[in-house]
From Swiss-Prot:
The gene is ureG. Keywords: Chaperone, Cytoplasm, GTP-binding, Nickel insertion, Nucleotide-binding. Belongs to the SIMIBI class G3E GTPase family. UreG subfamily. SUPFAM superfamilies: P-loop containing nucleoside triphosphate hydrolases. This is Urease accessory protein UreG. Homodimer. UreD, UreF and UreG form a complex that acts as a GTP-hydrolysis-dependent molecular chaperone, activating the urease apoprotein by helping to assemble the nickel containing metallocenter of UreC. The UreE protein probably delivers the nickel. It comes from Sinorhizobium medicae (strain WSM419). One of its GO terms (cellular component) is cytoplasm. GO terms for biological process: urea catabolic process.
């Protein structure tokens, strides 16, 4: 149920190509029967991710809003989140029954984080293809996100990444904070992410 403070807002961040849009699509398809959902995507100069989600039929088009952030996508989710907050306010007006809004950041680096004014929970997505050392490199996305998703685990043998090393490093860098290995192509790991959102988001 949406609270008097509005819907749960979940930020989805991660480097370009890590699988943010694929994750957003899978979460929408897994949760849309039970909850009233919407998505705000951030792209630098286009609305490409929003259009991709409409094409994937993740949600009806009126529930997907794309914002163009200009040159610094991380500013729109952190220092000046007003463009995203405005998009959420507009969705709220049109869809007053909203339970949950996903905010997908533009492709960013390991240092980008969501402002607490914008996101109640944060998911950070990295890809096995970026190298097995990514978890131990740290950065706020790795260490501070509420949930770390290590995506494309199926490609580990092809890129020479050792999942056991990645698991050990992620556990060391994150302490008690959870992380999940996933393969969005096959939907592997989606259920655990949904369970996390229900448990920690109070849905």
């Amino acid at each position: 149920m949406p609270s008097k403070n509005g819907p749960l807002r979940v930020g989805i961040g991660g480097p370009v190509g890590s699988g943010k849009t694929a994750l957003t699509e899978k979460l929408c398809k897994a949760m849309r029967e039970r909850y009233s959902l919407a998505v705000v995507t951030n792209d630098i100069y286009t609305k490409e991710d929003a259009e991709a989600l409409v094409r994937m039929q993740a949600l009806p088009s009126e529930r997907i809003v794309g914002v163009e952030t200009g040159g610094c996508p991380h500013t729109a989710i952190r220092e000046d989140a007003s463009i995203n907050l405005q998009a959420i306010a507009d969705l709220n007006r049109r869809l007053p029954e909203l339970d949950l809004v996903f905010i997908e950041s533009g492709g960013d680096n390991l240092a980008a984080t969501f402002s607490p004014d914008l996101a109640d929970l944060t998911i950070y997505v990295i890809s096995v293809c970026q190298g097995e050392e990514i978890p131990r490199k740290g950065g706020p996305g790795i260490t501070k996100s509420d949930l770390l998703v290590i995506n494309k685990k199926d490609l580990a043998p092809h890129v020479g990444a050792d999942l056991e090393i990645m698991e050990r490093d992620a556990a060391r860098m994150r302490g008690e904070k959870p992380f999940v290995f996933s393969d969005m192509k096959r939907g592997d790991g989606v259920e655990r992410i949904v369970d996390f959102l229900i448990l920690h988001g109070g849905l």
